């Protein structure tokens, strides 16, 4: 989660918490209701705010490619680790393998039957 998403979530939580604390009647009505009943909030309100928060978190996630798609070890072959530049590409890459290459090469007959 990047900083913009975290800031948006924090602002959203503060707005939700502030709306629950003040309510539609303001602070005077809140004091009266606090004197009348000092019971905790019913579990339905907690579930509603939790489900709302869960929905908002899912909505904030950007649909895109999974992390498994971005990690592609097969792109450079199996069990390749370290720097491939030193192993495969060198200034004189063809000279060391010359004898091996020509021993495996078979003559090609282009166009002759």
From Swiss-Prot:
Disordered: annotated segments? 22-48
Top-level taxon of the source organism: Eukaryota
Propeptide residue interval(s): 21-65, 79-92
Q: Does the entry feature the keyword Secreted, yes or no?
A: yes
Q: Does the keyword Protease apply?
A: no
Recorded GO MF terms: G protein-coupled receptor binding; neuropeptide activity; neuropeptide hormone activity; signaling receptor binding
Keywords (alphabetical) are: Amidation, Cleavage on pair of basic residues, Neuropeptide, Secreted, Signal
Return the GO cellular component terms, semicolon-separated: axon terminus; dendrite; extracellular region; extracellular space; neuronal dense core vesicle; perikaryon; postsynapse
Q: Where in the cell is it found?
A: Secreted
Would you indicate the residue range of the signal peptide? 1-20
Spell out which residues are annotated as carrying Phenylalanine amide: 76, 110
Q: Name one GO biological process term.
A: vasopressin secretion
Name the protein family: Belongs to the FARP (FMRFamide related peptide) family.
Q: Report the protein's function.
A: Morphine modulating peptides. Have wide-ranging physiologic effects, including the modulation of morphine-induced analgesia, elevation of arterial blood pressure, and increased somatostatin secretion from the pancreas. Neuropeptide FF potentiates and sensitizes ASIC1 and ASIC3 channels.
- What is the name attached to this protein's record? Pro-FMRFamide-related neuropeptide FF
């Amino acid at each position: 989660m990047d900083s913009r998403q975290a800031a948006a979530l924090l602002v959203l939580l503060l707005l939700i918490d502030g709306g629950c604390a003040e309510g539609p009647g303001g602070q005077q009505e809140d004091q009266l209701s606090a004197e009348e009943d000092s019971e905790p909030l019913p579990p339905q309100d907690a579930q509603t705010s939790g489900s709302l928060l869960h929905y908002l978190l899912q909505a904030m996630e950007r649909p895109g490619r999974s992390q498994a798609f971005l990690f592609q070890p097969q792109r450079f072959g199996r069990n390749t680790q370290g720097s491939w530049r030193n192993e495969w590409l060198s200034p004189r890459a063809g000279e060391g393998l010359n004898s091996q290459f020509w021993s495996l090469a078979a003559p090609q007959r282009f166009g002759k039957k």
